[in-house]
């Protein structure tokens, strides 16, 4: 089958023919329709330090997808051939304390689809049926293909009550932009998004941000004054992994504020812990999606009128995958879709 493979321990990705995966007793065989390129895929493409320490070569990459069930193991229940599905890319063990307690997203033995097991950038994917999620008929293939990063946005944004709150989002990557759309949709008051990428900030504005701030040109405090904010932000969503952005967030939080952190900072980050202690801030780390509460929330948000369509800015045939990776790497895109049909 046609697959995108990290075939060499160097920059790049290669379209190759690989064997069709075998289906286990509890697995689904999914024929891929569309996939989306993730920031993780760009790390793997660029072969950075994280990738060199994490990715087995060769491996089929990719974990954002939608497809159709075309086969299943004999023990599978609840699915039928022809079902349209996406799926949770974190494959969990089922036997650790968190898994047995129902906190599956906190499994310490998690494997990643397209990271350390074969991924979705292929004509066919096999995953445990437990990890698959049926896509409602009124949600398009394009939107279904980005459920994985949309789930990161939903998990982060809905970690704390947002109704009537002022929300600061640092980092206008696709996940930060989708988080802004979610926050506004569920009733946040002011949703302010910071970054230094004008293209992405304009996209955030289209997706519902009250105000976008290019912090290389504007002062966040001036924007807060402009919005009539006298007490700081109630909720912070740190999506950038940039230390100076996190420090600025701590500085601008109201007393009793809550921060959800999805962005991954460098190993050593200096933090003024006095801001955390004396303001009584709560900081929560976010990894992936809650299984499967986040998935049901994603479907419900879209069915209740949340419009994510502007975040998908480019679509390429899989044969033009290089254009897709170049576009994603340019910083002048939202989500980039690869069409396998």
Curated annotation (Swiss-Prot):
Asked whether the keyword Plastid is assigned, the reply is no
Pathway in which this enzyme or protein is active: Amino-acid degradation; L-threonine degradation via oxydo-reductase pathway; glycine from L-threonine: step 1/2
Q: Which SMART domains match?
A: PKS_ER
> What EC number(s) does this enzyme carry?
1.1.1.103
Q: Where along the chain is the active site annotated?
A: 40, 43
- Name the residues annotated as site: Important for catalytic activity for the proton relay mechanism but does not participate directly in the coordination of zinc atom: 148
Read off the SUPFAM superfamilies from this record.
GroES-like, NAD(P)-binding Rossmann-fold domains
The top EC class is oxidoreductase
Annotated Gene Ontology cellular components are: cytoplasm
Q: Which InterPro entries match?
A: ADH-like_C (IPR013149), ADH-like_N (IPR013154), ADH_Zn_CS (IPR002328), GroES-like_sf (IPR011032), L-Threonine_3-DHase (IPR004627), NAD(P)-bd_dom_sf (IPR036291), PKS_ER (IPR020843), Zn_alcohol_dh (IPR050129)
Q: What does the UniProt keyword field contain?
A: Cytoplasm, Metal-binding, NAD, Oxidoreductase, Zinc
Biological process (GO) annotations?
Answer: L-threonine catabolic process to glycine
Cite the binding residues for NAD(+): 175, 195, 200, 262-264, 286-287
A Pfam family it matches:
ADH_N
Q: Which cofactor does it need?
A: Zn(2+)
Localized where? Answer: Cytoplasm
HAMAP family referenced in this protein's UniProt entry, alphabetically: Thr_dehydrog
Name of the molecule in the record: L-threonine 3-dehydrogenase
Gene label: tdh
């Amino acid at each position: 089958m046609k697959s995108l493979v990290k075939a060499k321990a160097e920059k790049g990705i290669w379209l190759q023919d690989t064997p069709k995966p075998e289906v286990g007793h509890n697995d689904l065989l999914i024929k891929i329709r569309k996939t989306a390129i993730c920031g993780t895929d760009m790390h793997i493409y660029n072969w950075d330090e994280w990738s060199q320490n994490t990715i087995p070569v060769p491996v089929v990459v990719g974990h954002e997808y939608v497809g159709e069930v075309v086969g299943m193991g004999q023990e599978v229940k609840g699915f039928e051939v022809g079902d349209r599905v996406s799926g949770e890319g974190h494959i969990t063990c089922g036997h650790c304390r968190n898994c047995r307690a129902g906190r599956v997203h906190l499994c310490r033995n998690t494997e990643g689809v397209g990271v350390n097991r074969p991924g979705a950038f292929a004509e066919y994917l096999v995953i445990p049926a437990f990890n698959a999620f049926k896509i409602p008929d009124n949600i398009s293939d394009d939107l279904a293909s980005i459920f994985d990063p949309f789930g990161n946005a939903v998990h982060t944004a809905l970690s704390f009550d947002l109704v009537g709150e002022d929300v600061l989002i640092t980092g206008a990557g696709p996940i930060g932009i989708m988080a802004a759309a979610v926050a506004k949709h569920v009733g946040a008051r002011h949703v302010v998004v910071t970054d230094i990428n004008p293209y992405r900030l304009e996209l955030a504005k289209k997706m519902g941000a009250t105000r976008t701030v290019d912090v290389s040109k504007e002062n966040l405090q001036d924007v807060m004054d402009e919005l009539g904010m006298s007490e700081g932000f109630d909720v912070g969503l740190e999506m950038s992994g940039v230390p100076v952005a996190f420090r600025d967030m701590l500085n601008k939080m109201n007393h009793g504020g809550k921060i959800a952190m999805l962005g991954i900072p460098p190993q050593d980050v200096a933090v003024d812990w006095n801001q955390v202690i004396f303001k009584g801030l709560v900081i929560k780390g976010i990894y992936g999606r809650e299984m499967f509460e986040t998935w049901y929330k994603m479907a419900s948000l879209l069915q209740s009128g949340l419009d994510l369509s502007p975040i998908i800015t480019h679509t390429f045939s899989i044969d033009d995958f290089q254009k897709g990776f170049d576009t994603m790497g340019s910083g002048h895109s939202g989500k980039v879709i690869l069409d396998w049909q």
